[in-house]
Amino acid sequence: MESSNQENFFETDTQQAKRHLRAKKEANTFGNPLRMPSKILAVIPDPKKPQSSVLIAESGGRVSRINTETRTTTAKYTGPSVPVTCLATGGASNGVLFAGSWDKTVWSWDLATRRPLRRYDGHSDFVKAVVCGRLGDKPILVSGGADKKIIVWDADSGRKLHTLQDPTTTMMSLQHLAIDPVLSTADEIVLVSASSDPHIRRWRITLDSYSQLPVDETPSSADPAAAAAASSSGEEKLTIQEHETSVYKVLFDVMGDEVDLWTASADGTAKCLVRERAFAAEDVFEHGDFVRAIALTADWVVTGGISQQIKVWDRTSGALRAVVDAHFDEITDLVVLRDPAGRSPDVLCSVGIDCTLRTWPLDHKGLDAVVEEIRAAAEAKAEDEQEGEKKKKGEGKKEEEEEGLMTAEEEAELAALMEDDD
């Protein structure tokens, strides 16, 4: 019979260290973890209760509605038999739930009744990103896939309106989509797409047409000479390139005056791309390792990813304010739970490959308390381990000493033998 125990297979020292660290962290209860039956790949606020409820996409092939205060599953949306990767809400009264899946389709349900609605079939590979908008009186669904295509749908009829592909710069697998709330109008959506390449693209979409939106060069651009040369030659800059490799998340800061674009990348950074500077990077946050997720508040920039750590940065100074080390596998998504009436402080919700959903206070006092709790627990555990090692060494030494000692009977026999030799 073959063994599935990892310890029975060849592992590098790094792999062993990671596995041992994961085993140590697995039992922790920081963030009041809710353990789900499968990996959690995405999370969005519940539009009906954004301060206390979320929707999560699970690798087990379902979407769950979770009350973050009671830690209970209040609804299950089923149908897919493969992982669900991404979520969005839209449609009439924001009452339709959309979910992209590994089965190459987008599923939809009535958010209130859980009744399955239409499926959108048009991609030739995994669907990895979905977002909703409106064009005139029509609700619109936009999906992006591993097939390197963006598809725009009439959400009501299921009719495919457009298929977007970059004709000049190779666009890889789609990772995330966002709608620009400043440039979009009643009859036109400006879509931002991120993919498994360094290029961020913008698209102008109407019911009848679409085009790739050039990036406006300004004298304040990073390279004014290059901007002037491009302008004089008639060349258009069609992509924003501020990262070195894949961009996993794009997020507009709707709380800020300029509504700048924020990004998270596999190059280990999160960045603020400033609208008035043609989306050139201004603030850079060096998270380290792949950054899968980013969330924003008035005070903080929050990042998470493969390192398993949540890092909280001061928005004003850029300083690292806190490191929350609780998940024991990759963090896949972050979302801020915000009371629309402002009656309660913001709360961060994090989800990951470790099958857990956790929540964290984002007020200064609450955040400090969490960091101190994790630090104190780590110190106590380290002391326990040191004591255990000392005890183990002491027992080993005692055994060695005992092995070197003879019983009274053995000593008498040895003395008799020595007398016989004399």
Regions found by a protein language model. Give the residues of each.
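A short helix->beta-strand "capping" segment at the edge of beta-propeller domains
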Residues: 11-40, 70-72, 231-235
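Beta-strand-rich domains and repeat architectures in extracellular enzymes and scaffolds
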Residues: 32-61
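Short C-terminal beta-strands that terminate individual repeats in beta-propeller domains
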Residues: 30-35, 73-79, 116-122, 160-169, ...
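Terminal intrinsically disordered, low-complexity extensions flanking WD-repeat/beta-propeller proteins
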Residues: 2-25, 211-231, 288-290, 297-299, ...
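WD40-repeat beta-propellers
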Residues: 63-67, 106-109, 130, 150-154, ...
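Short coil/turn segments that connect the beta-strands within blades of beta-propeller domains
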Residues: 50-52, 92-95, 137-139, 187-189, ...
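Conserved strand-to-loop turn within each blade of WD40 beta-propeller repeats
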Residues: 57-60, 99-103, 143-147, 155, ...
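Canonical WD40 repeat/beta-propeller blade segments in eukaryotic WD-repeat proteins
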Residues: 35-46, 81-90, 125-133, 169-184, ...
